Amino acid sequence: NGDQLSPLKKEIEKNGGKCFAYSLDARKEEDVINFINKIETEIGEINVAVYNIGANIRFNILETTSKKYYKVWEMATFGAFLMGREVTRKMIPRKKGTIIFTGATASIRGKEGFAAFSGAKQAKRALAQSMAKELAPKGIHVAHVIVDGAIDTPWVNKLFPEYVKEKKKIDGLMKPDDIAQNYLMIHNQPKNAWTFELDLRPWVETW
C-alpha cells in the first residue's frame, strides 16, 4: 500500500537516508517481474531482498473457506516464490546476493485455529530451505528468520493499545530497527559462517 509507505519514506529521508517506495500486488506474477526490473533499472543492483508479507488469520478448520486458505497461501508462499525466483535471476550472473524470508513460529509448528497460516508459513520455510541449498554454491545467501512476537508498528499500536502499553513498560515489544539490525547482520556474514535460520523474540515471549 503506497499510502502506508509514505510516512515511513518521509521519516527515513528526514533522518538523512535515501528511500524509494513502491506498491504492488505481490501475488501477481507480471507485477513482481516488472517491479524487480524497475528497481534494477531505476535504482541499481538488488543486493538484498526481504520478503515479509503475510496474513495471520484464525479460524477453525470448518470456518476456513477455500478462499481464505488460498489467499493466505498466496500472500505468504506464492508471493515469496515469485520474489525469490525473480531476484535470483538477477543475482546468479553476479554470483552474490542475499534473500531473506520472514517467518513465524507457525513456520515450524501448527496450532489449533491456524491451519491456513501454519500451512502457508511452513511451505514458505520449505521454499527458503530448498533455495538456500540450491543457491549457496552460486554465491547467494538465502535465510529464513522466525519473528516471534508483537512488533512496535502503527498498526499494532492502534489495534492493541493496552497490550502495547504494558509490553513497552518491560521492553517486551519488538522494535523494527532491532529486527532490521539482525537482517543486516545476516547479509554481512562471511561465506564460511552463513546462517540459514534465526529466531527473534522478546525476552518475555513464551515459546
How does the language model describe each region?
Residues 137-149, 162-207:
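C-terminal helical subdomain
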